[in-house]
Amino acid sequence: MKRIIYTLLLLYIVLFNTSAQKSVGEWSTYLAYYTTTKIAEANNHVYAVADGSLYSYNKEDNSITHYSKQTGLSDSDINFIIFNPEVNTLLITYSNGNIDLLSDSGIYNLSYLLDNSNITDKTINNIYLNKELAYLSTNFGIIVLNMAKKEIKDTYKLNKKVYSVVIDTDHIYAATAAGLIFASLDSNLLDYNEWKNYTLSSSEFGTESIRQIGLFKNNLCFLADPSDKSKTGIYYQESNGTVKNLLKNRDLKQMVIQNNKLITYTYSELYIYSSFTDRDVVNAVVINDIASLKDPNTFWIASGTSGIKGIRKNNNQYEIILENTNDNTKYPKRNYNYFMTMHENKLLVAGGGRGTDRWGRAGTLMEYEDGKWYNFNENEVNNKFRRVRDYTGIAVDPKDPEHYFISSYGEGIVEIKNNEVVQLYDHTNSALTPITYIPGLNPLDYVRIGGVTFDKEGNLWATNCEVTDALKVLKTDGTWASFGFNKFTNAHKVDKITITSNNRKWINADEGILIFDDKGTIDDKSDDESH
């Protein structure tokens, strides 16, 4: 609760000081739109998901629109979007199973899966559209959503993980973890016994390795990912039952069938099939998802940190029609805000964290000042030293506002000056200590720092978790000192430090609150007091 109140207070302060257009008490939402991973083309817009947040690109005026709970969405952390031209509606699903339908008439929420206590695993693996119906592949079966009526039509509880679904004239097919199954559309699909195994005559892969199934040129197509990665690829079944390979590539990520095209891709290469014998290959730098709904020669790509990229085929050449929609000064890099602090009207955010163990989050440092974000590139630390993750705190040098120390729950303390990496402190070059040695663990990954702060003299104080001496200090002369307390010996969650005007250090942990007073003599421990 204290962290929530502290976070809200900091947000209010920064928004009050930097958002001149906002009236007092009016909130703004700052969501990350840094890495675009999902895309869906609609009539006049291209919708995309970046870091779990929805935005759109207007194809007519090139404007960007962002969507959030403030604009009517029911939830956050989006995992799928797909546009259904039959009903002119965007289907949005969230990682917790919640569902929104976005159309010109507004946003309609369907919380069937979210609220269903009988379904514990609410993972949605894929979505297939057939007229006004959307078939949601889940870890327990298939949910059929009528997008025109805005209601759940059916739930097929197959008691197995379903990766993908497709429908032809007479049958519905499902790629599951147990293999490929199918049923007649005229049968009672609610009855598990109506679903039968579908056999493929292929020595290349087993049907349990099919991750996506589709229909192209009236042929069943499969993205198979068998244990033998040399056979990963796109396959299709001819009318006589023969299974043929279309493309083998161990790096294939997805198969998309839209606009009478079969499209598959690796991280940086597109394969666009107009038929089983007519293929274009396009290099596109970064590809996370692709959509093509309106013009069969125009393709929209979810291109990571470049946002939305558009390409068009013209005279047998592919040209870029949209290079980049990202403006990284407008958004935080990630939706992580484990620790925040204000310094001279600048908001500093450490996007890491910890629980019973480390969270494994990339070292995320973000700044917000004068209406703009600066997102520090964690690779500058990773490349100069090693990978540093799980930032837990930030301390700003009182004598230099561009000089920071960032604590990490695993790698020690990172020193940054003028947005450049200066040093990484761990047990090899400081008094910081790794946790008690456990065979097989690299001590460089277990220098666990809970928080950092400066005192008024310019000494940097840090809490060191799961060690004998839980409190460390980097003095102004560049040397270190350590302090141990019986209550905090090997304490798991020694956390933040607050230094009061009388120079006492207040430190919180699961074991309680420690108050430490060094009497202003760091090197003389004879007069120290703690309780």
State where each predicted segment sits.
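Carboxylate-rich, polar loop motifs that coordinate divalent cations or form catalytic acidic clusters
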Residues: 20-531
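Bacterial Sec-dependent N-terminal signal peptides
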Residues: 1-26, 461
